[in-house]
Amino acid sequence: MRVPHRRRVAPQFPQVGKFIRVCAYDRPGTTRFDGTLSPSTTVKQPTTAQEGAADLHALLRGAKQKGPYVLVAHSWGGLIARQYASEHPDEVSGLVLVDPASEFLQDTLTPAQWDAFVQLGKQPREPEGIEAVDYGSSAPALRAAPPVRGIPSVVLTSDECFELLPDTGGAERQCQAWREAQDLLAAHLDAEHITHTDSGHAIQAENPELVIASVREVVEAARRKSCALEDKNHGQCHKPEKHAQR
């Protein structure tokens, strides 16, 4: 998960680490705690969810981290996590999506709002090299990808309105579109949908205990599912690893 730079350590990492191993990484172009760019290798911007999934796959292979993983992702990272799960279904045992963006925004925003949202995501950022995202290419690719179903999943949705498209007006309708898109996403994944979060977009910073509880719930469900399968086939229970996406 990407953590606002004002926090030096994501508060949920050490807590989650008490019940499962946590692996976190800095996506190329994300910022450190002081607002400077992370030390990750720079990539061409804007980037797509498909490129993000490929980077994550290469990272896990390079770090020799064996799955299956429970992927935890925030905002744009939600598209990356779902793309990864679609491309590597045997490697993913659960999803925790924290106020995720999704392709369903194209259905709930007006065409003009969607175009503005896509252009906003692709805008060059300062300093040079900071992450810009290509929803216009990522959304149709994710729609065409095999659906991710049959694994424990939780979607956490902000219940405090935030400015999705600054300086365009209609903030309340935009917030409604964001929530409707998350309704569609949760239904698409057959996921538990938690909408009473007492948070804006950065749920992981504003309500970390809820994120921790959701991760625990998905990890335990993934373990039960894995144990049932192992007991049936081999009589041994395997506990999945967890990967937390920053």
Regions found by a protein language model. Name each.
Residues P124-A145, Q176-L184:
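Active-site nucleophile elbow and catalytic-triad environment of alpha/beta-hydrolase enzymes
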Residues V96-Y135, L165, D231:
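Flexible "cap/lid" loop of the alpha/beta hydrolase fold
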Residues K66-F104:
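Conserved hydrolase catalytic core segment
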Residues A24-V70:
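Active-site loop/oxyanion-hole signature of alpha/beta-hydrolase fold enzymes
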Residues V155-T157:
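Short beta-strand/loop motif that positions the catalytic acidic residue
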Residues A191-R246:
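Catalytic active-site module of serine/aspartate enzymes centered on a nucleophile-bearing elbow/loop
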